[in-house]
UniProtKB/Swiss-Prot annotation:
NCBIfam families: nusB (TIGR01951), PRK00202.2-5 (NF001230). It holds the Pfam family NusB. The keyword Transcription applies. Belongs to the NusB family. This is Transcription antitermination protein NusB. It comes from the Bacteria.
Length: 160
């Protein structure tokens, strides 16, 4: 995978303002996860594309790219958790949007500052409704409920 650094676009370090909506950031990250799953070599063109398509600044898109890379680094671990929670379905049979919504949500749960589980589930459902099909919402909610209530999995059980 090609690497993209902020220096490629500007000489200043990246900082994100508190005013940037977290919902919008999740949408951009989800789009990046999807795009990089479809074409891993497309990273260099992803930043300008998302800047034009989402009307978001370069700084925020680069922050999203950094978060996306962090999720991809943990994807094997996250995929294992998702796969273990599936009862009558294989991980490979999941739609790509569903996989990436689950990865994003679980990454936020296990590797980010604490966020209420109900908020994470609501955000996952919102993303599925926006980027996939609403019929998948109960399935996503059930998977996340199973994972969040599994006592063997908690924020401290994964390697950070």
């Amino acid at each position: 995978m090609a690497t993209l650094s902020p220096e490629k676009f500007s000489g200043s370090p990246i900082s994100i303002s508190k005013e940037f909506p977290q919902q919008k950031m999740r949408e951009i990250i989800l789009q990046m996860l999807y795009a990089l799953d479809m074409a891993p070599s497309a990273e260099d063109s992803l930043v300008p594309l998302l800047m034009s398509q989402t009307a978001v600044s370069q700084k925020h898109v680069l922050v999203a790219l950094n978060q996306t890379k962090s999720i991809l680094e943990k994807s094997q671990e996250l995929d294992l958790i998702i796969g273990n929670a599936l009862k009558n379905k294989s991980f490979d049979s999941l739609d790509l949007v569903e996989k990436n919504v689950l990865r994003l949500t679980l990454f936020e749960h296990f590797y980010s500052p604490p966020i209420n589980k109900a908020i994470l589930i609501a955000e996952a459902i919102r993303l599925v409704k926006k980027f996939s099909y609403s019929e998948a919402c109960p399935f996503i909610q059930a998977i996340l409920n199973d994972i969040f209530t599994d006592s063997s999995l908690n924020e401290n059980s994964l390697s950070i």
